[in-house]
Amino acid sequence: MKSTPENFELKDGRMCTIREIQVKDAEETVEYLKTVSGESDFLNSYPEEIRFSAEEEANLIKGFNESDDTLMLVVELDGRLIANGTITRFRRKKMRHRGNVALAVLKEFWNKGIGTKVLKCLEDYAKKLGLSQLELDYYSGNERGRLLYDKLGFIQVGETPNAIILKDGTRYSSIKMVKSI
C-alpha cells in the first residue's frame, strides 16, 4: 500500500476517509465516473462515453496499485465514493521528476475542502517519489478549479485554445499549470 487511509473532517463537520483505491471499488467507481462526468462540463468525458466494465476497471485499478508511478486516491463518506484524485509520474528518464495530477468531486460535495485535501495528499506522495514538479490541466470555464489550484501554488504556463467543444458548441481552452515542490 502506497498511501495510508486517513480520516478527515469536511467543512460541514462530516467525517470521511481518503484512501488508495482498491479492486473491490471497481463497480462503484464505474458508476461514480458516470455520475461525476455528467455533473460538470470540465471533465474529459460525457457519461455515455464511460463504457468500460467493472472487470476492466478492476484491471486498471490493479495496474495502478502495482505501479509506483501512479496513485489513485478515493474519498469515501458513509461507504460511498464521493471524489477521486490521481497522480501519474512521467515514465521517460528525462521527465521522471514530473507528475501529472487530476481531480474530480461529486457536485453535492463541492466547496467542502475535499479538493484541497486530495491534492495535498497527492503532493505528499509526489515528494516521497522524489518528484520536483506537479502539473495539471483544467478547462478555462472552471473558475472553481482555478481558484483551488492558485491557492495551492500552481501557476499557469500555457493554454490550448478550443481544447474541448461541448454538445451545445461552447468551446473551452485547456490551461496548463505547474507547481514546483
Enumerate the predicted regions with their spans:
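Helix-loop element at the rim of GNAT/NAT acetyltransferase active sites that forms part
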Residues: 30-48
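A short beta-loop-alpha structural element at the N-terminal edge
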Residues: 16-28
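Conserved acetyl-CoA pyrophosphate-binding loop and the N-cap/start of the following alpha-helix
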Residues: 109, 113-121
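Acetyl-CoA-dependent GNAT
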Residues: 49-98, 102-106, 119, 180-181
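A short, internal acetyl-CoA/4′-phosphopantetheine-binding micro-motif in the GNAT/acyltransferase core
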Residues: 102-111, 139
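Conserved GNAT acetyl-CoA-binding A-motif
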Residues: 119, 126-137
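Terminal substrate-recognition subdomain of acyl/acetyltransferases
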Residues: 1-14, 168-181
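Conserved catalytic-core motifs of GNAT/GCN5-like acyltransferases
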Residues: 135-138, 150, 155-170
